Structures are given as structure tokens and as C-alpha cells.
Amino acid sequence: MKKSTVTFGLSLILIALIIPATVFAGDEISCTRGGMNRAIAKYIDAQTKGDISNLPFAVMVGYKENMKAADIKAGILNTPMKIDHHASILDTSSCQTFTEIIVTDKEKPYVMGTRMRINHDKIAEIETLWTTTGYWLFNADAYLKYATSEDWGPMAVEKRSSRGTLVAAANAYLDAFLEGKLDLVPWGFPCERVEGGAYTGKGSPDDSCEVGVPSGVNITNRRFIVDEVTGSVHVFCNFGPDTPDGGMGSADSHLFRVENGRLRYVHTLTHMLMSDFKGNKDNVPKQ
């Protein structure tokens, strides 16, 4: 056998070995922006199909819906959805992602927020808060209209804030619900807030998110996901305190974009039926 033939044969074997490894590496999730985006793509594909079989779960993956432990095999992830829009933020410091999903299907519309935690090349936790018809101020069509008109993309470096500043801005906003100290919130102008589907913006440079903020409400159990690149910070929290009988405030999601240290956009979802609303002047949900 000629040497050239042997060399050619060995080359083919090496190519056959290298290509699958390269493809696999390109598909692998990790705690990098690229790796987390790949995890999100897999999650969106699974939610679209209602099929979790191809998600790379860690052993004993943690799963919650509306802040309560749930069976991932029976959860909303198994419901096929026609997703109209999704957008995500990436926290490379804590290896977490947050994804907002909007579904305007007339039969079963949803607006959802999902947190994932990545552990090396596996999804270690998934937590979803979902809202649908009958929930607090729900209007998926309006939410889609307003969310898609906003810029949540990478921010110019000179407009970005530090991780600490982003968390402080979110805390100041949420603290105002209890203390009523609105002057401590870094309000930006304009600032637009989408709450379930209700919108505070009027297209004016003076638009404010300082509209309809109640007082005397303790927003508890705050957990943060921070993306300095997009100037975004997400908070899963409870609208109201835990109670001695094991109850807790309504499961709540707040997503903020901060430009030049000031609030630009606020998105809010609350897993609370409108029929459970007390209807008092302070917007306090039933406990």
C-alpha cells in the first residue's frame, strides 16, 4: 500500500473523530454568555414543543412554578406553546438566566418569566412564574405590543452601571412599596412600566414609572439576576410577607432596565387572580 493512501485514510479517520466533537462543543451549554444563550435556545425549543426530553438536566434538577416546588414532568414546560416573543438576560457571575415569554394564543395566552441556573454543562434549576387570563391586569396582546417596542439589547459602555448599582436601583423601587420613600428611587425620564399588560407610558419625554406605586406593602424573598451588559436586573419576590401558617405573598416578577444609573423600563408579572384582589386603595393582595 502506498504511503499516500495510508496518510489519506488516517486523515479521514481523524476528520470523522474531530467533527462530532466540534459539533458537540458548539452545542454545549456553560456559564458564559454564549453557553447560556444555547441553554435558553434549548429551553425555548422545549417549551414550544411541550417536550422536555432533550433538555440537559442535572441529576435531581430543581423545579418550581410560581415559587412552589413542582413535578417537572407534569409542569407547564410540558404544554406546547406558540411563542410570539421571548427575551433574556444573562448573569455570568451567578450562572443564571431570566427569560420573558409572551404567548398571544387566543385559546390559552401566557406571559411568563423563567429563571434557569446552569451548573457547568447542565441545567440545575428551572423556575417559572406564569400568568394567563384572569390574572393581575393580564393582557398578552398589550404586553407584546409594548415589550417589542422597547430596547433591551446590549447597552453602550458609557451608559452601563455596576452590579451593585443595578441591585440598589431594584431594591430602592421595591422598598418604596413599603416605606413610600419615592424620592430614594432613581427615576429616569422617560420611564415606561408594563404591569401584566397595563402601561404607564404616553409617548412623552416626561413619562414616569412613579405612577400607582402603593405604600405599606412588604415585598419579600427577593432574588436577583443581574446583566451588566444590557443594564438589566430581574427580581423574583413575594408581594407581601410569609405568614405563620405557611402562606406567602403573591409570587411576583420585576424586571428593570437601568440606563445611566436611572430606571428606563419596568416589567411586572404577578401570579394573582384578579378575583383574589382585596380592592383596597393600597393594592394589597389577599394573604
Feature map (PLM): residue ranges:
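Bacterial N-terminal signal peptides that target proteins for export
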Residues: M1-L10
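C-terminal and inter-domain tail/linker signature
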Residues: F24-Q287
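Bacterial N-terminal signal peptides
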Residues: G9-P20
